[in-house]
């Protein structure tokens, strides 16, 4: 598929490797670039291949979406940042989540989905660390003192896809696959 013009072009080949991203853009909120739209899955399906495990999608829980978009890195929580719900409560508490905000991504994402609103609280962060290691987030907080930094999970990685053999071949002769377009390699998470 030609990106300019959108017409289909045929290039005969003895071997083809599907190596493309997942389909993050089927979700309104994703960490994927705009071109990750499931094209590899569609090509595989057009060749008659089954897709498996497509219901398993990993969500990245650390995305600021308002007042601007930005990813935060988990080590920020080692330096005093916490997640709070719309009532101001820290919902990733020790009783239920021993590792708090540093639980596995799927655990944090599910906890966030259960809340009405999730806010990033930076009040406990060392300011020098924040300015040095996360200058864009520090600037966002400084430039918007009356607006909370709102967090939500975003679609990140499809665990399912094209079934493979150990040599990356598929059930279609000459068609191989690797990368996120493949399925059954990563389990449900």
Predicted regions and their residues:
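A glycine-rich dinucleotide-binding beta-alpha-beta segment and adjacent secondary-structure elements
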Residues: 3, 135-182
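Conserved beta-strand-loop-beta-strand element in the redox core of flavoprotein oxidoreductases
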Residues: 1-10, 16
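A conserved FAD-binding loop/helix module that cradles the flavin
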Residues: 26-43, 47, 172, 184-189
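Glycine-rich phosphate/pyrophosphate-binding beta-alpha loops
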Residues: 22, 29, 59-62, 159-161, ...
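Alpha-helix capping and helix-loop boundary segments enriched in small/acidic/polar residues
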Residues: 4, 8, 27-35, 71-74, ...
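Short hydrophobic core segments
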Residues: 11-21, 44, 176
């Amino acid at each position: 598929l030609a990106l300019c013009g959108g017409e289909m072009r045929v290039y005969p080949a003895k071997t083809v490797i599907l190596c493309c991203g997942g389909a993050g853009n089927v979700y309104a909120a994703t960490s994927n670039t705009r071109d990750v739209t499931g094209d590899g899955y569609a090509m595989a399906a057009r060749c008659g291949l089954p897709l498996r495990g497509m219901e398993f999608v990993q969500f990245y829980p650390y995305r600021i979406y308002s007042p601007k978009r930005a990813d935060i890195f988990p080590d920020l929580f080692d330096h005093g940042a916490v997640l709070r719900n719309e009532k101001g409560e820290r919902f990733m508490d020790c009783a239920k989540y021993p590792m708090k905000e540093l639980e596995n991504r799927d655990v944090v994402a599910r906890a966030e989905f259960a809340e009405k609103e999730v806010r990033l609280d930076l009040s406990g962060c060392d300011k020098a660390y924040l300015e040095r290691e996360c200058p864009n987030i520090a600037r966002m907080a400084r430039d918007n003192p009356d607006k909370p930094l709102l967090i939500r999970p975003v679609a990140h990685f499809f665990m399912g896809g094209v079934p493979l053999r150990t040599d990356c071949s598929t059930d279609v002769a000459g068609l191989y696959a690797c990368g996120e377009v493949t399925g059954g390699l990563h389990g449900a998470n």
